[in-house]
Amino acid sequence: MATGKIVQIIGAVIDVEFPQDAVPKVYDALKVESGLTLEVQQQLGGGLVRCIALGTSDGLKRGLKVENTGNPIQVPVGTKTLGRIMNVLGEPIDEKGPIGEEARWDIHRAAPSYEEQSNSTELLETGIKVIDLICPFAKGGKVGLFGGAGVGKTVNMMELIRNIAIEHSGYSVFAGVGERTREGNDFYHEMTDSNVLDKVSLVYGQMNEPPGNRLRVALTGLTMAEKFRDEGRDVLFFVDNIYRYTLAGTEVSALLGRMPSAVGYQPTLAEEMGVLQERITSTKTGSITSVQAVYVPADDLTDPSPATTFAHLDSTVVLSRNIASLGIYPAVDPLDSTSRQLDPLVVGEEHYNVARGVQGTLQRYKELKDIIAILGMDELSEDDKLVVSRARKIERFLSQPFFVAEVFTGSPGKYVSLKDTIRGFKGILEGEFDHIPEQAFYMAGSIDEVVERASKM
């Protein structure tokens, strides 16, 4: 392959000169003689290409030889990546020796064509009551997990990985984009303790790494997920955090000298997001279901980054600090969370009516809270007292002990089937369990467990 030399270094941006007849293509990976990998971003003319460094540019100097690999970055894919931690280039960073890949795929790939895509809306049962009832996931759908610090985004993610790995024998890929190294480390140990590490591939581009790494690490993880999908599997693809993917794009864009757009974001924000999201899709062979943690800067949902993410999501799971402060986990807000799948044509009339009934009861309770705070429960009508009693039972029944949180709760985790979830909430709404005290509903699995618990009270 052609050889060039470094002519300019500006931080993470490196200009390389090649012979006029052998200029690398955009997105080609170049290898510097020091071992650093560069990715071509722009062709400047006259044999010059502008690249972004996928690693620290410390110690580079002008005149160093650069070789064109002739391909985009290629990463290992297949079952050998399971249970391993890799960086953006697919190199192992867990000190467990080489990966021994079955194949290597380019990280820049075209999204599946219209003919290949599958349009069935099959539900993915997660075993988590509040998600299955209020904001059901679709196989091959995209889910946004919105929440502040400490309300349980990571624990929810780990429970989903665990449930799908064990109950559906599915594989998961976790891309830590701009992660804190400590969080990545915690996640690895949690997965090991839950015995699901052999079903998860972990790809990390930590906070301290150059913007090129953080921008590409989501694509590396996605490429590994696509390989599993093309083998006919149903894969889960987790991204934490999609906001930091956007932020890395902003840094790269500024370094390349592009004119910034609204709020200083890159002018190509929608395109970059689209390139990633359009590849996360189901084909007739298998599905990729993605769960993306979304940080909302300054709680402003109209900020260009979350606003661009919203356009691609099928379900939004909103985690609420108020619910977490009541000790109800998972702290999903049933009134704020939405799903495109909550439609009688998709989930059926019974599921739809129960979910809307639950939301209606909780909404009425929310309206009555002010009256209760001022005048007390005694001033309510009999009907309203019944609504409050049922709403409080529903609130508590939406909590659930997680398998990955057994060390915190001290109670064994529960997986609740969708059928049991609907039966339980339907019974509460119809007054079947009005005689059972509300504390019996807290941190329970199915409704049978609640009845059994109440009989011992």
From Swiss-Prot:
The UniProt annotation places ATP binding at 147-154
Q: Pfam families annotated for this entry?
A: ATP-synt_ab, ATP-synt_ab_N, ATP-synt_VA_C
Main site of residence?
A: membrane
- What are the leading ranks of the lineage? Bacteria, Pseudomonadati, Pseudomonadota, Gammaproteobacteria, Pasteurellales
Assigned EC number: 7.1.2.2
Which purpose does this protein serve, as stated in its record? Produces ATP from ADP in the presence of a proton gradient across the membrane. The catalytic sites are hosted primarily by the beta subunits.
Q: Does the keyword Nucleotide-binding apply?
A: yes
Tell me which family the UniProt entry assigns to this protein: Belongs to the ATPase alpha/beta chains family.
Q: Name one GO molecular function term.
A: proton-transporting ATP synthase activity, rotational mechanism
For the keyword Iron-sulfur, the answer is no
Q: Which reaction does it catalyse?
A: ATP + H2O + 4 H(+)(in) = ADP + phosphate + 5 H(+)(out)
* Keywords noted in UniProt: ATP synthesis, ATP-binding, Cell inner membrane, Cell membrane, CF(1), Hydrogen ion transport, Ion transport, Membrane, Nucleotide-binding, Translocase, Transport
Catalytic EC class: translocase
Subunit and partners: F-type ATPases have 2 components, CF(1) - the catalytic core - and CF(0) - the membrane proton channel. CF(1) has five subunits: alpha(3), beta(3), gamma(1), delta(1), epsilon(1). CF(0) has three main subunits: a(1), b(2) and c(9-12). The alpha and beta chains form an alternating ring which encloses part of the gamma chain. CF(1) is attached to CF(0) by a central stalk formed by the gamma and epsilon chains, while a peripheral stalk is formed by the delta and b chains.
Q: Which organism is it from?
A: Haemophilus ducreyi (strain 35000HP / ATCC 700724)
Please report the name of this protein according to its UniProt entry.
Answer: ATP synthase subunit beta
